[in-house]
C-alpha cells in the first residue's frame, strides 16, 4: 500500500515535472520565435529606415537638380532675350544709318567724338556689325585707352533722337507698346549681364523637416510562428500565460516564473497594431517618418566685370511706376504711369488688362518684371508686367495644392493664388527668386511663397505667435542680411489696430515677437533705412482714437526699441493727428493712411516719397506727392524742422489716391 502510494506520488511528481518541462519547452520555442521575430522586425526597421532615407535622398536629389536647372534656364533666358534685343537694335540702327534721307541720327556726348554718326574708339563711322560688335568694339570700348570710356553714354531719348520727315517727337506723346523701342533705344543696355553662382550646403537642416510616408512590408513569419499564431490555440503570449496560470493555480512552486514574466503583455502590441486581412497572410503597419531636410541650395547673381565697366559709362536710370489707384470720381483706375526722374514727367503705359480693384500688392524682381498679386475683385489673379516690352500677361499656375473652386480661375481654369487668393495683404521680394505673401483676406493663415522662376506657390509651415498672418493692412520690410521679414502693425478681425512687431526668419521658418509699437496702427507707410538700421512707420490709422495719424515712429533694429519722433518747432497749422503730444508730433504734411504700396524710399539718396494717401475719418483724398530727405532726421528730438516738399515730383497724369502700388526702379 505504501509502495503504491509512493509510486503514485512519484508519478504525480513526474507528471508535474513533464507539464513543467512541456511549458518550458513551449516557452523556449516561443522565446526562440520572439528572438527571431525581434531580429526580423529590427532588420525590417533598419531596412525601411534606410530605404526611406535613400528614397527621400533620391527624390531630394531630383528636386535639387530640377531647381538647379530651372534657375539656370531662367537666368539664361533673360540674358538671351536681352542679347536678341541688342541684335535687333543693331540691325535697326544700321538700317537707319544707311538711310539718311529718311532718318537723322544724332548722338550728343559731352566727351566729344563728332556728330552725325555713331563713333566707337575701335572703329570709324558706319554701321555696327554683330559679328564684330563684341570681340572688336567691346574689347576696344572697355580698354583703358578708349577715348570714349571717359564720356558717359546717354541711353535716353535726349541723346539718341530718331526723327522722321514729319518731325514727330516721340517724347511729346505717351509711351505705347508700338513705340517703346523708338523712345528708349538703348534701354536694354541697362539690363545687367550677370552670371549665376550657387552655394550648396551638404548637411541636414536642423529646423526644417519633412514627413515621409512609410508603408511597411508584410512581416516575415516562420512556420512555427505561423502555426502558433494562426492555427493553434495560442493567439498571443496572453494565451500562453493563461494556460500556465491555470496550471500554476495548483502548483505553488511556479511563483518565480510568474513573477518574472509580468511584461509579456507588452508584446501584445506586436499583434494589436497589425492589420490582418481575411486570408491571414499579410500584416502591415502604416506610419509617417519625420526627416530633416537634406541640403540647402542658394544662388547669387554676380555682375560680370566687363558689364560693370560698360555700365560705368552709361547714365543711371531711375523711374517710378505707379499702377492702379482710385480716382476722385470714385472709379477704380487701371492705368499704369511711369515717371522718369531725368525727364521730369509722367508717361502713360499699357493699362492693366484685368480688374484688380485697389487692394493688391506689387513687387519688382530687380530685373525687368513687376508682379501684381490679388485684389478684392480678383483675389486669385497674378499679373506680370514686362518693363522693356510694355506688356502685361496673366500668370496661370498649375499648383496641385490649390483645392478651392471659388470661381477665380484663369483662362485655362487654373486658380493662381491658393486659399481663395489675397487682398489687403502685404508682399515682399527677397532679392533672389521668391515673393512672400502674408496676411490679408480671406483671413489667410498661411505664408505663401511664390517662386518667380518656376512660377509656383508653396506654403511655409511656421505659425505666428501673435497671429499676424490673420491681420490685414500690415507693413512689411525685408532685410537681406538676416533673410528676415518684419511685420508691423495691422488690423485684426474686430477692425482694431494692433501694435505688434514680428520678425519672420525665412531660413528657420520661425517667428520672433519684438518690441511693440508705441502707437498701434494699420495702413501706415513703412520703409527701412539700411544705413542707420532704422525702420520708419509713417502715419496710418489708430482705431483706439478713431483718427489718422501724422506721426513718425522709428524702430532701432540694433537695440529693439521704438521712439516717436518729435518736432520741437512751432507750427502754424493746428492738427490733431498726433498721439497726444499736440503740435510737436506733427511730422507728416497731413494725417493720412499711406499703405506700403504708396511709399517709396530711395536708399541711395536717402529720400522718401509719399505718393498720395487717404484719410478714412474725414474722407479726404490726397493726390499730392510729398518728398523728404531723411538725412536731416538725426535724433528723436529733431534739431532741424522736417520740411516736406510738395509735388517736387509732379502730380500723376491721371490724378489718383488711395490704393494701387508705386514701385521705384533703378538701374
UniProtKB/Swiss-Prot annotation:
User: SUPFAM superfamilies per the record?
Assistant: Galactose oxidase, central domain, Kelch motif
Q: Where are the Kelch repeats?
A: 319-366, 369-412, 434-480, 484-531, 534-582, 607-654
Entry annotated with the keyword Coiled coil: yes
Whether Transferase counts among this entry's keywords is no
Give the UniProt keywords, A-Z. Answer: Coiled coil, Kelch repeat, Repeat
- InterPro entries tied to this protein: Beta-prop_ATRN-MKLN-like, Gal_Oxase/kelch_b-propeller, Kelch-typ_b-propeller, Kelch_1, Kelch_domain_containing_8
Region (Disordered) residue ranges read: 248-281
Coiled-coil stretches: 58-98
User: What are the TM regions of this chain, as residue ranges?
Assistant: none
Which is one Pfam family of this protein?
A: Beta-prop_ATRN-LZTR1
Name the UniProt record assigns to this protein: Kelch repeat-containing protein DDB_G0274267
